[in-house]
């Protein structure tokens, strides 16, 4: 059993972090926190607007601050942005403050799930498939390094993925938020 004050979901866009995260939070009676939403709330601007005005570097700065703020808490299910693992300080904080679940998804499944999504700044290009392959090649080793548990979400609906995780977490994650 791995004791941790928070349950943290990592993985690429389209893996199901928000959808599965909400379901898991309800199942485990945890507060659901979406780091991307925390960024939007703190900045007072949408993620595409932040990217437009500050670039990816500016966005990552907002992300680092929001993640640090969120992970001060406990008893939360935290859904991170896909690129949160790029920063070594973020990785250290994530590892220290939670039980980390990597929701893996194939590029083919990402393309299907994100086909109509216009809110992803990194995908506002004609070569979406190549972008996703490049992101996966760079980020997958970082996700794997951090993960306490990995679930491939390709074959599952959000409900089925949640059910799979409930079973796996019952034997691997020890809640630490219920004491102190």
Curated annotation (Swiss-Prot):
KW Phosphoprotein (keyword) present: no
Annotated positions binding ATP: 14-19, 120
Reaction equations catalysed: shikimate + ATP = 3-phosphoshikimate + ADP + H(+)
CDD domains for this protein: SK
GO biological process entries: amino acid biosynthetic process; aromatic amino acid family biosynthetic process; chorismate biosynthetic process
Superkingdom, natural source: Bacteria
The protein's Enzyme Commission number: 2.7.1.71
Recorded metabolic or biological pathway in which this protein acts: Metabolic intermediate biosynthesis; chorismate biosynthesis; chorismate from D-erythrose 4-phosphate and phosphoenolpyruvate: step 5/7
Compartments in which it is found: Cytoplasm
Cytoplasm is among the record's keywords: yes
Binding site for substrate: 36, 60, 82, 139
Family membership noted in the UniProt record: Belongs to the shikimate kinase family.
Protein name listed in UniProt: Shikimate kinase
